[in-house]
Amino acid sequence: MLIPARLKQNDEIRIIAPSRTLDCVGGFAANQTAQEKLTQLGFKVTFGNYVSGMTLDGTNSISERIDDIHTAFSDPNVKAIQTVIGGFTSNELLPYLDFDLIANNPKNICGFSDFTALANAITAKTGLVTYYGPAYITLKMLDKAGAYQDNAFIQALTQKHYELRPSQTWSSDEWFLSDSKRTFYPTAWKVYTSGRVHGQTVGGNVNTLFLLAGTPYQPDFEDKIILLEFADDGETWLDFSRLLAQVLQLAKRPRALLLGR
């Protein structure tokens, strides 16, 4: 596996939009708090040329998105790459990625949701460790959920070893709206099979993950710790149930299975 160098103070983080753009979520002004937070944490924030603007599906063209990815990996000053948000179409970029360029310039890259396709493809084709974590706009959360997220994000990208403990609370609301009233619930994990394991993790958003099935970008699930999350907006537990069945048919002997939302 290729493990990118840990982030240090004053390192540059490049923001890109492989799926939806900043214009889908209010533009630069509405997300200024995210940039301010990264700056306060000691990092330099720069943006790809195509993080704004969009077509009917909320993205920019394939060639523009590919250009931002390749430019970020090529730039020696960039030490980490973070996606704006998720979306629906990062998988259409995969045939056009220069995986040799990425492998020769390993960097930290982080995002969530639709980023699953990009993250797993990069790892499958290059061996580069990728990070399933906060997207750029989630950094504007200033409440206790934001504090937990920020701490985990910084630990993952700056430390070689750290202990990740579950958040004490969770919410399912419109966190991205500044005037949204948030309701937090106590975290209640349910353990079906207890034990201790170590190994490599693979996974992400389960809906997006299976866009890779049968392609050269499908991850190797065998003997892995599988992490899966499922968005609860507009879909049911029945949808998740059949996707989970497919996971278990692809991975005959996973080391562990962790489920989230």
For the regions a language model picked out, list residue spans one by one.
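N-terminal glycine-rich "phosphate-gripper" loop used for MgATP/nucleotide binding
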Residues: 82-91, 96, 112
